[in-house]
Amino acid sequence: MSDLQALVSQLWIYPVKSCGGVSVLSANLTETGLEWDRAWMVVDAQGDFVSQREAPRMALIEPKMRHLEMVLRAPGMLALHVSLHEAEEPVQVTVWGETVKAYDMGALAGQWFTDFLSQTEEGRALGPLRLVRFDPEFQRASSTKWTQGVQALNQFSDGYPLLVLSAAALAEFNERLTAQGLPPVDMARFRPNVVLSEVAAHTEDHAKALTIVTDQRSVTLRPVKPCPRCSIPNVDPQTAELQPQVSAVLASYRQDARLEGAVTFGMNAIVTEGLVPANSDEPEAVLKVGQAVQVQVF
């Protein structure tokens, strides 16, 4: 094993699962990942989560975090103001077949999403929809098959608290796109939380640990599982139009034997050192763009 030096070049949160992301300069590192990441989710009448796979227009919904509220904007819609600290009745919802406790955010929020996401790309009706907030008292853990027995908690992510990606991986992918006469894409397609610069493409694939010395304490992230890619990177986040050539180019060189040939891009990661217990008065570690990262590679 050897050590490399990287930098945190971007930090992203996605407050509403499958909606637009927010590029931030700093973020508190909580036991479920970056603060406010995937804290809300859109569900259908059965309580099943809705994503860009069924509703590409979710990519056009832009969240903005304020002191006491989240403000959501979308083309042709009035802004929706969502309280950060209030919710309505408790509900049970489903994420990838897993039942999760949540709170409904009310009729106004539900109608807003129903109106904007009224039908799928194929014309199938989606409504009625609801916006729900993750119940912070509920513990939703990552698969210990991949965490080597470590309990890692999530909110509404697909299964892990963090997604790490190297900036060079995107640059390499864009070189492959342009070589085929296709336009380059931006980082928003791949929805990472932590982007690393100053290292080679896909260094995260071979990293055993990522150590960041924050102002509060040293934290260690462990990449544990390659991130399999579905159709979401095909969705242009600016237009919500589908561009299937993105997946086709990925599949040409990113089939991963660790996941039986699935196409992967980026690594799901957990926090192994530096978290503050939920009942502690200590401040949480704050990740910042520009922080140095010690990358221990196999």
Predicted regions and their residues:
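Metal-cofactor-dependent catalytic cores
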Residues: 1-298
